[in-house]
Amino acid sequence: MNTFLFPTLCLLGVWAALAGGVTVKDGEFSFSLESVKKLKDLQELQKPRNPRNLDGPIIPVLCNSPKFPEELKPICQKPNAEEILERLETIAQDPSTCEICAYAACAGC
């Protein structure tokens, strides 16, 4: 009986960790990795196609988009929103690295 108890508890622990998902933390903020992935997709759609338009800030465009994840909206109110979104985009570029907790900002593996 005890032979099966330990492996069962281990499997339950792994399942509980995976069910909670991966959390990305940046300062006072904490987001699901899924929201960060959506942000990356949205930023790729919003990148200007005309090289002359690179001077304008992209934050208002992102924050006002109807596809912008609700979970990330508090970032838009911060003066350093662009810096935070850049850090999140770095994580989103390779989400598999975050899923194995290679970044200190990621938790819940």
Swiss-Prot record:
Highest taxon of the lineage: Eukaryota
Swiss-Prot/TrEMBL keywords: Disulfide bond, Secreted, Signal
Localization: Secreted
Statement: the UniProt record of this protein carries the keyword Disulfide bond: yes
Disulfide bonds: C63-C76, C98-C106, C101-C109
UniProt propeptide residues: 22-94
Keyword S-adenosyl-L-methionine: no
Pfam families: Guanylin (PF02058)
Similarity remark: Belongs to the guanylin family.
PANTHER family: GUANYLIN, GUANYLIN FAMILY MEMBER
The protein's name in its UniProt record: Guanylin
